[in-house]
Design a protein with these regions (language model features):
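Conserved N-terminal phosphate-binding loop of PLP-dependent enzymes in the Aspartate aminotransferase
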Residues: 1-192
Length: 192
């Protein structure tokens, strides 16, 4: 749950792919579109993949996905057939999402609010490890988190995700304000 590869690993991976002629495909379905505090999470590592998969954030809840290809691939009209691709409503939603991300500075907000949450969450001794970037945060505990999640949702009305039995996942909307982050921390503290 929310394990961030090191820059060294990612750069060595890029190097190995380049040296062997292997295509580097990065899955940015969850981490892309500002979630990590940069538009794409791999931008923290100063690398360029050959293919990037995107979804989730691209449509802000509307079902949409995409594949971004590097210039090394020559697109050929009619090469890929689909019975569902190019949905006009989905494409309109994706364009609107891009406008809102830019106009409301949501990537910058995800970084600022995420950095604040990461720093504050590290102060809780009950948490074994705090990891993540931007508004993609994993909290690992020594004990299973089932009861903690139940108290958060039923007592404090805070929905969280989970990974395995011991990791609480925080993936709030990119528009989460600093005030809302502080409110989350206050509610989180109550259930620990």
């Amino acid at each position: 749950g929310i394990k961030i590869p090191t820059t060294e690993f990612m750069q060595e991976l890029r190097k190995a792919c380049s040296e062997t002629g292997t295509i580097l495909i990065l899955d940015e379905i969850q981490s892309g579109y500002g979630r990590s505090g940069k538009f794409f999470a791999h931008q923290y590592n100063d690398i360029k993949p050959d293919i990037i998969t995107v979804a989730k954030g691209i449509g802000n809840g509307f079902p949409m996905a995409g594949v971004l290809i590097s210039p090394m691939f020559k697109p050929v009209y009619g090469q890929l057939g689909t019975t569902f691709g190019g949905n006009h409503l989905a494409c309109s939603a994706a364009l609107a999402v891009m406008d809102v991300i830019e106009q409301e500075n949501l990537v910058e907000n995800a970084k600022a609010v995420g950095d604040y949450l990461l720093e504050e969450l590290k102060k809780f001794p009950q948490i074994k490890e705090v990891r993540g970037r931007g508004l993609m945060i994993g909290l690992e505990f020594e004990e299973p988190i089932k009861e903690l999640r139940s108290r958060l949702i039923y007592d404090e009305h805070v929905f969280t995700g989970a990974s395995g039995t011991n990791v609480l996942r925080l993936l709030p909307p990119l528009c989460l304000s600093m005030e809302e982050a502080k409110e989350f921390l206050a509610r989180f503290k109550k259930v620990l």
